[in-house]
Swiss-Prot record:
Its EC number is 3.6.4.-, 2.1.1.-. The lineage of its organism: Viruses, Riboviria, Orthornavirae, Kitrinoviricota, Alsuviricetes. One of its GO terms (molecular function) is hydrolase activity, acting on acid anhydrides. Residues 72-290 form the Alphavirus-like MT domain. Interacts with RNA-directed RNA polymerase 2a. The keyword Magnesium does not apply. This is Replication protein 1a. GO terms for cellular component: host cell endoplasmic reticulum membrane; membrane. It is a peripheral membrane protein.
Length: 991
């Protein structure tokens, strides 16, 4: 039997890829990779681009950002330079994504020269420095105001209470501090060094930005960026279009690329086939981003790194480092990819052939033209005949030809003004080559004596030639012997960076600090992510069984909160094991944070008012505004109903709401009290303006050393009753978080809200800090969770108190920052002793299971609520709900207390009450927001929701807890429409 052998490895290598299994495996792998890319793209941020883009432009933006963002090209509207505008939006988002951000907040970022309305509408934590340098900037601000108004009118609830964060100062003058910054096409007027100085003024260490870029700017006087359809051109002044005609070779030979002319050279950017506004900038500023590498200023060294250059846009980053920088050679290069197919040709720039200039010509065109010129050259022919031959070949290589009815571009078109001079230069170059070759041949073929004489006489000939060129410059045309110039495809820059910044930068300590800070923020972020995941994965809770009826027993309110007698007020408090030094450090840190917070609130108020004043045409010299103030203030009035203008005649632009009194105003003199004869502007922050005083006073106080005790009790556990029983006028003072709580405690204690005794012993924390007050040994604090820990410490320090006994519910609404950009870390109370009270005497019996059910749905898994024990109230069923079609169907009963989650719903109820001619006391005292009603107790309460648009407050356990625990007898929830995630509406039917 015959046998045969074969090499299995060779067969697999040659035929393996043709097998069905191999093809199927490749298809499966390709499908998985495509699916992963698609899923990644779907998870990316959705970016909607309304500009109409053609196919080529769409590919440009998808290639650059399609892998990072889920791009939706809506093709809705034609816009000037549409691709540039679309790229600008993606560049802004890309630069912001470079910096740290969490699900809770984004670290504050500065935007030098950016569009503040873009950040405002998207909710970015960004402060824009948008100076009004001219009419163009003011036009842009006016358009942004209109855009903001347009969006807010369509969805006012989303922007309720939100203010745009920007100023009209230059980047170097603004005082807002942030570690990070962006500059989207904002560095043209500042230059590299200007950006570095602005970063230094803001304490910024990293900046990421973009700008239009074309390497040919270093060589040419004009050029074209094809992707952006942008033509750039250097001009010598803002009012002259004369081009910069300096020899390009001289520019390349200069290592520093000095100015083209002694005067200022500008560069203009024009968009082709678009009769829109162009941009003109100082060429030196733009050039600095290409030539400069480092800059040392005010103890910091800044270095620029060019990251990505695509579609005519360069993305760069500038990083600032402190301390000493030892000597180091920094090298970078700028590439000219468009130069590789070109050669420089010197052509006459004047009729006397004294001035010459260099033009670019396609290498293939010059090579073929010169080849034919060399072959056809004949010194016996008339020069005109040779010139015509060269022009004919040059024309055929740089014109449009028609073949079989189809037009084709041969080579590249030559400038009409240079066409004849290029041909003439090629003729001179050809003739010069033949003459040089002839001299070389004659020298090679000459006798020995002639060669010796030529070599000996050469120094004399060179000397006399130099003298003639100096004395008679017009006799130089024959000396132009180098017609061809080799164009480099790149240019390099070498710079030695060395800076003595004093003390060395301790990178290790900085790394430890950043790591600790990031762990704290990451922990909070992880908790929020876990909470959101629990909401998505929560299994529907089974219906709560009815609670067995509790036999009513009389309860002595004096024993509430576990306080049997006055002497045993803190028997159940557990002492904490923290050292006194650690306690003082914590309190001092909290006080510093609170003072910084109040200062930022004051600075923000001044900045907002200054921005409005400048937008309306005011300045810091004259007490006057321009004629467009109505448009400006109508736009701001749609966001803040307390924005207004006071005229010198005493008239207001808008009627002042009843009960509102402005304590300060703003004009060219700044923020402060104003006279009736002055022109000034106001907003909601001018009603009570005490942030600067609180900052100054808190900063001057030392951290207290006394003991802080906390009674953490549920709603209705008798906290106010306990305060009444413990209060001793000789040693105590009662402190509340707000004026409404102070009035409630005064009435409960003294049966009066304005008597001398009531106002002396029950005061708000702000009142104690801002006014004179006697020293006491003990402070009783009501609703302490509404106070910043630093403010509580400041109150104790000013009163010289040795003990603070604080009452509150840690699960209810806590102190929250009014400035989203402020990094709040130490606002939560850190007590030395704690005690819990989990029995409610106010809430009916069905409230506790309702609260437990809401906690199950809203709080992270494993988190328990204090509302675990039953209620001591005799009322068993109190909670109901019903749907209403509109505010007109909400029953306004003077015997009921009405609460809302938002100020907008509160305003609607007040308007409805006025339409029904209800007493003023009703809509003034008995219609409040949930936040305002914390600490209030009423018999009958109605919660009203008039909109079904997204509102996160209905998902927050703390707000819903306050809402359902204000009543003693009945609670009714009236709502318009279905709201997804409405915690109260979802839980009431299950109780």
């Amino acid at each position: 039997m015959a046998t045969s052998s074969f090499n299995i490895n060779e067969l697999v290598a040659s035929h393996g890829d043709k097998g069905l299994l191999a093809t199927a495996l490749v298809d499966k792998t390709a499908h998985e990779q495509l699916e992963e890319q698609l899923q990644h793209q779907r998870r990316g941020l959705k970016v909607y681009i309304r500009n109409v883009l053609d196919v080529k432009d769409s590919e440009v933006i998808r290639t650059r950002y399609g892998g990072k963002y889920d791009l939706h090209l809506a093709q809705q509207e034609l816009a000037p330079h549409g691709l540039a505008g679309a790229l600008r939006l993606c560049e802004t988002l890309d630069c912001l994504d470079f910096f740290p951000r969490s699900g809770l907040r984004q670290d504050l970022v500065l935007d030098f020269g950016g569009s503040w309305v873009t950040h405002y509408l998207r909710g970015h934590n960004v402060h824009c420095c948008s100076p009004c340098l001219g009419i163009r900037d003011k036009m842009r601000h006016t358009e942004r105001l209109m855009s903001m108004r347009k969006v807010i009118l369509n969805d006012p609830q989303q922007f309720d209470g939100r203010q745009p964060d920007f100023c009209t100062k230059s980047a170097a003058e603004c005082k807002v501090q942030a570690h990070f910054a962006i500059s989207i096409h904002g560095g043209y007027d500042m230059g590299f060094r200007g950006l570095c100085e602005a970063m230094n003024a803001h304490g910024t260490t990293i900046l990421k930005g973009t700008m239009m870029f074309d390497g040919a700017m270093m060589f040419d006087d004009q050029g074209f960026i094809p992707e952006l359809k942008c033509q750039w051109r250097k001009i010598k002044s803002a009012f002259s279009e004369e081009e910069d005609a300096t020899c390009s070779a001289a520019k390349l030979n200069s290592s520093v690329f000095s100015r083209v002319r002694n005067g200022k050279t500008l560069i203009a950017f024009d968009f082709v086939e678009e009769s829109t506004m162009s941009y003109v900038h100082d060429w030196d500023n733009i050039k600095s981003f290409m030539t400069d590498q480092t800059y040392s200023f005010n103890g910091m060294t800044y270095g620029i790194e060019r990251c990505v250059i695509y579609a005519g846009v360069m993305t760069y980053k500038i990083v600032g480092v402190p301390g000493m920088c030892p000597p180091e050679l920094i090298r970078h290069c700028i590439w000219f990819p468009s130069m590789k197919d070109y050669v420089g040709l010197k052509i006459p720039a004047s009729d006397d052939l004294v001035k010459w200039k260099t033009v670019r010509i396609l290498l293939s065109t010059l090579r073929e033209t010169e080849e034919i010129a060399m072959r056809c050259y004949n010194d016996k022919k008339n020069w005109m005949d040779l010139f015509k031959i060269i022009l004919g070949v040059l024309s055929s290589k740089s014109s449009t030809i028609v073949i079989n009815g189809m037009s084709m571009q041969s080579g590249e078109r030559i400038d009409l003004n240079d066409y004849h001079y290029i041909g003439f230069a090629i003729l001179l170059h050809t003739k010069l080559k033949y003459e040089q070759l002839g001299k070389m041949y004659d020298m090679w073929n000459a006798s020995f004596i002639w060669k010796w004489f030529a070599s000996m006489s050469r120094p004399f000939r060179v000397f006399f030639s130099t003298v003639v060129k100096t004395l008679f410059p017009t006799l130089r045309p024959r000396e132009e012997k180098e017609f061809l110039v080799k164009l480099s495809t790149f240019v390099t820059f070498n710079e030695e960076c060395s800076f003595d910044g004093g003390k060395e930068w301790d990178v290790i300590s900085s790394a430890a600090f950043v790591a600790t800070q990031a762990v704290a923020d990451g922990t909070i972020l992880a908790e929020e992510k876990a909470k959101k995941l629990a909401d998505r994965l929560a299994v529907p809770v089974e219906e709560v069984t009815a609670i067995p009826e509790v036999s009513p027993t009389p309860v002595d309110q004096g024993t509430a909160c576990g306080l049997e007698t006055e002497t045993s007020e803190l028997d159940s408090l557990s002492a904490q094991t923290r050292s006194p030094i650690a306690r003082i450090a914590e309190r001092a840190t909290a006080m510093l944070e609170y003072s910084a917070y109040e200062k930022q609130l004051h600075d923000t108020t001044v900045s907002n008012l200054q921005r409005i004043w400048c937008m309306a045409g005011g300045d810091n010299k004259r007490n006057s505004l321009e004629s467009n103030l109505k448009f400006v203030f109508d736009t701001y009035f749609s966001v803040d109903a307390l924005v207004n203008v006071h005229f010198p005649t005493g008239r207001w632009m808008h009627p002042v709401p009843e009960g509102v009194v402005y304590s300060v105003g703003y004009n060219e003199k700044g923020l402060g009290p104003k006279l009736d004869s002055e022109l000034y502007i106001v907003n909601g922050d001018c009603v009570i303006s005490n942030s600067h005083d609180l900052f100054s006073i808190t900063k001057s106080l030392l951290a207290p050393t006394g003991t802080i005790s906390q009674v953490d009790g549920v709603a209705g556990c008798g906290k106010t009753t306990a305060i009444k029983s413990m209060f001793n006028p000789s040693t105590d003072i009662i402190v509340t978080a707000n004026k409404k709580s102070a009035q409630d405690v005064r009435y409960a204690l003294f049966k009066s809200t304005d008597s001398k005794e009531a106002c002396a012993f029950v005061r708000t924390a702000d009142s104690i800090l801002l006014n004179d007050c006697p020293t006491v040994s003990r402070v009783l604090v009501d609703e302490v969770v509404l106070l910043h820990f630093g403010q509580l410490c400041a109150v104790m320090s000013k009163l010289h108190a040795v003990r603070a006994l604080c009452f509150g519910d840690s699960e209810q609404i806590a102190f929250s920052s009014r400035d989203a950009s402020f990094d709040m870390r130490f606002s939560k109370l850190i007590p030395d002793e704690t005690s819990d009270a989990d029995t409610t005497f106010r809430s009916p019996q069905d409230v506790v299971p309702l609260v437990r059910l809401m906690a199950t749905k809203a709080l992270p898994k494993g988190t328990r609520t204090k509302y675990s024990d039953g209620a001591q109230s005799k009322v068993r069923k109190s909670v109901t709900s019903r749907a209403v079609a509109s505010v007109s169907l909400v029953e306004l009963d003077p015997t009921r207390f009405y609460i809302t989650m938002t100020q907008a719903d509160k305003a609607s109820l007040i308007t409805r009450a006025k339409e029904l001619n209800l007493p003023k006391a009703f809509y003034t005292d008995r219609i409040k927001t949930v936040h305002e009603s914390q600490g209030i107790s009423e018999d009958h309460v109605t919660l009203v929701r008039l909109k079904s648009t997204k509102c996160d407050l209905f998902k927050k356990f703390s707000y819903c807890l306050v809402a359902v625990t204000r009543h003693k007898v009945t609670f009714r929830y009236e709502y318009c429409g279905v709201l997804g995630g409405d915690l109260i509406a979802n839980c009431i039917p299950l109780v």
